Curated annotation (Swiss-Prot):
Cellular component, GO annotation: extracellular region
Expression sites (tissue/organ): Expressed by the venom gland.
Disulfide-bonded cysteines: C24-C43, C36-C61, C65-C76, C77-C82
Subcellular location: Secreted
Family annotation (Pfam families): Toxin_cobra-type
Alphabetized GO MF terms: toxin activity
Leader sequence segment: 1-21
SUPFAM superfamilies tied to this protein: Snake toxin-like
Keywords linked to the UniProt accession: Disulfide bond, Secreted, Signal, Toxin
Entry's family note: Belongs to the three-finger toxin family. Ancestral subfamily.
Protein name: Toxin 3FTx-Psa1
Major location (coarse): secreted
Length: 90
């Protein structure tokens, strides 16, 4: 009878994702994805026209949505791998 609570606790630990880590696309290639660090709850995508081929895109994790610098456009979202080119942003 004493083992029942222990078994239930183990089952709950195995099947519940108690510490979900956000996953975001990173770098300038949208195929790669990384686990965000603790406290980083937002995926971002920065776009500007200063790249070699006219458009530079950088993606990654952040604690909050970064502010745009210069003429860049910044988009943020908060679900796994949501910062790819085809996602909706807020």
């Amino acid at each position: 009878m004493k083992t029942l609570p222990l078994v239930l606790a183990v089952v709950a630990f195995v099947y519940l994702d108690l510490a979900h880590t956000l996953k975001c696309r990173s770098g300038n290639v949208c195929i790669l994805g990384d686990d965000c660090s603790e406290g980083e709850n937002v995926c971002f995508q920065r776009k500007n026209g200063t790249g070699v081929f006219g458009m530079r895109v950088v993606r990654g994790c952040a604690a909050s949505c970064p502010s745009p610098i210069g003429g860049e456009e910044v988009s943020c979202c908060s679900t796994d791998n949501c910062n790819n080119s085809f996602s909706r942003f807020f």
